């Protein structure tokens, strides 16, 4: 708990975190399921696991941790991280945990989603037995192809309408395609129920898609402050510098959200005139689009 204590001393209000230490296969399997090992089974999750495993085996990528937005926050740590890596990762986790707690886009997410996912998986198994695996899997394929087409304004609605009850008429935004299909499409009852379950999950994951740069930037901002401020021993400085620079390094591939988010938060801290107060205010109200703008 030393890392959390140092984080709180530095001004970061860290909520309760439960840590699980796993090997790389277990971590890749959990990551493929979006952080929920109790989630329903589907071939796309298996395909994602295979991609993560091959990336790890070929040295193309490595997951050091996985943080899940629940209450308490659930953090999966890689068993074979070196001591300085584990310290860095735990400082990084503290940033994620605070971001989930404080950012406005997460205000209406369901923090009991671990139990909800388990209930969804049980119901999907029942429907698969009743209607056939091929029919169910084919329908889930179609829903998953649209699962980013939910509206941020629908997050609160999703909390209030579990199971197969559709949202209220007249309260759906045009961009909430899954919501409109759920309400208006002539679907059999079992398909409507599956759609409602998957839409609830899509609404849960939506804030993470909208704040990827900010979330990773906030975690990186705090791991760098904590590690260089009080957590590092003299003998660990070089190892930390190698780990940090590896995570922040640029490439010819996709944008690095860790680097971009870190530099944006450092810019706010250095140039806004508000110091840490301005940084905390920024992390509370923005998504990636408004933050970059």
What are these regions (language model features)?
Residues 2, 6, 93, 97, ...:
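Generic, well-ordered alpha-helical scaffold segments in large soluble proteins
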Residues 18-28, 111-112, 116, 241-246:
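Acidic helix-start/capping segments at beta-turn-to-alpha-helix junctions
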């Amino acid at each position: 708990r030393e890392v959390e204590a140092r984080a709180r001393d530095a001004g970061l209000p860290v909520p309760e975190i439960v840590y699980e230490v796993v090997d790389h296969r277990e971590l890749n399997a959990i990551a493929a399921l979006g952080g929920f090992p109790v989630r329903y089974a589907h071939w796309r999750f298996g395909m994602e696991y295979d991609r993560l495993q091959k990336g790890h085996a070929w040295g193309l990528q490595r997951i050091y941790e996985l943080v899940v937005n629940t209450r308490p926050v659930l953090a999966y740590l890689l068993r074979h991280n070196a001591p300085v890596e584990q310290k860095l990762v735990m400082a990084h986790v503290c940033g994620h945990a605070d971001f989930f707690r404080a950012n406005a886009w997460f205000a209406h997410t369901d923090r009991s989603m671990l139990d909800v996912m388990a209930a969804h998986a049980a119901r999907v198994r029942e429907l698969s037995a009743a209607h056939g695996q091929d029919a169910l899997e084919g329908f889930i394929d179609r829903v998953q192809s649209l699962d980013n087409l939910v509206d941020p304004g629908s997050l609160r609605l999703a909390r209030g309408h579990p199971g197969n009850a559709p949202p209220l008429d007249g309260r759906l935004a045009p961009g909430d395609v899954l919501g409109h299909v759920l309400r208006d499409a002539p679907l059999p009852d079992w398909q409507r129920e599956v759609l409602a379950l998957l839409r609830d999950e899509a609404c849960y994951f939506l804030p993470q898609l909208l704040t990827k740069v900010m979330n990773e930037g906030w975690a990186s901002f705090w791991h760098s402050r904590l590690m260089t401020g009080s957590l590092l021993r003299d003998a660990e400085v070089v190892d930390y510098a190698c780990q940090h620079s590896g995570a922040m390094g640029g490439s010819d591939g996709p944008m690095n959200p860790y680097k971009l988010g870190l530099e944006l938060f450092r810019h706010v801290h250095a140039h806004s005139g508000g110091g840490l107060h301005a940084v905390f205010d920024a992390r509370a109200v923005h998504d990636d689009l408004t933050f970059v703008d």
